[in-house]
Amino acid sequence: RDFLVLDWFLFNDQRGALAPGESYRPLSSQLRDALLARKQAIPELRILLVTDPINDVSGGDPSADLAALRAAGIDVILTDLDQLRDSNPIYSGFWRAAIDWWAGDGTGPGWLPNPLEGGPSRVTFRAWARLLNFKANHRKLVIGDNSAGELVGIVASANPHDASSAHSNVAIALKGNALLPLLQSEI
């Protein structure tokens, strides 16, 4: 294998408050560990992970998983959501005119509850305000090459997101040139 391209909307362990006796499969750490092991076993393997800024709460709660992947030499790209159409146009206009320039870069100590986690985690006002745009890259795909040099991949409804671990999902496996347009759209 020469390369692996992954594009997932949700790649995190944030799951909100759990009811007594409730648990989730740790999908995000399982995938993180598998990618790190693969990169360590084959250092020349080029791995690209494209994911959404929601995974670090729009900068308000940086993802340790994404940081570990970057530290191992895996390319991690956060989708530039500003390039997407507004899904909440009334708010998004207000965001650009009155909040975006004023709210800083979103780093620093947070004081608002993390909307995605039930624990003590806190995020900045900017993180909350940016999330209200409701923009997201909902793609879920994996493309790589096999030992014969053929393109192989899946397009799925699943996310490596702990709180999504109990969801029912579907996927289609593809092979060959049918994956070229998807691959070209990712790189």
Predicted regions span which residues?
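HKD-type phospholipase D/PLD-like phosphodiesterase module
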Residues: R1, L10-I187
